[in-house]
């Protein structure tokens, strides 16, 4: 049976909503619907699975391993499992994107430094 969920019904706030697959029948994917203000984003971290960023509006600077990627709306950034990564919104307006975790739950290890 299909499930239909309104964005506002997902846990979170005005800048981030979270979907965990384990809470929706064990679907093997989780994601954030993100709207990051300029200069905001997570510090470097890793996941034991790949993460895919789909940019809908704005732009961001992504750290992926030793690489820096400038990405804008219409781009997809894929970070392999275990690779240190993070991003900061670089556009004058919010960076709107979907951050897809290829797991039914989100596991994050923050990197010092």
List PLM regions with ranges.
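Glycine- and acidic-residue-biased ligand/ion/polar-headgroup-sensing regions
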Residues: 50, 55-60, 65
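A short, N-terminal "cap"/entry segment at the start of jelly-roll beta-barrel domains
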Residues: 1-29, 109-113
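Short acidic-glycine-tyrosine-enriched beta hairpin
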Residues: 67-81
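Conserved short histidine dyad/triad with adjacent acidic residue
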Residues: 32-47
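Ligand-binding loop in jelly-roll beta-barrel domains
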Residues: 81-107
């Amino acid at each position: 049976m299909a499930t239909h969920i309104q964005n506002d019904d997902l846990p979170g706030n005005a800048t981030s909503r979270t979907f965990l697959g384990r809470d929706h029948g064990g679907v093997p994917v989780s994601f954030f619907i993100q709207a990051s203000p300029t200069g905001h984003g997570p510090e470097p971290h890793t996941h034991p699975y790949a993460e895919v960023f789909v940019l809908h509006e704005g732009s961001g600077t992504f750290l992926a391993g030793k690489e820096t990627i400038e990405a804008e709306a219409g781009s997809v950034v894929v970070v392999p499992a275990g690779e240190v990564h993070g991003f900061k919104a670089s556009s004058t307006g919010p960076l709107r994107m979907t951050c897809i975790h290829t797991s039914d739950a989100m596991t994050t290890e923050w990197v010092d430094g």
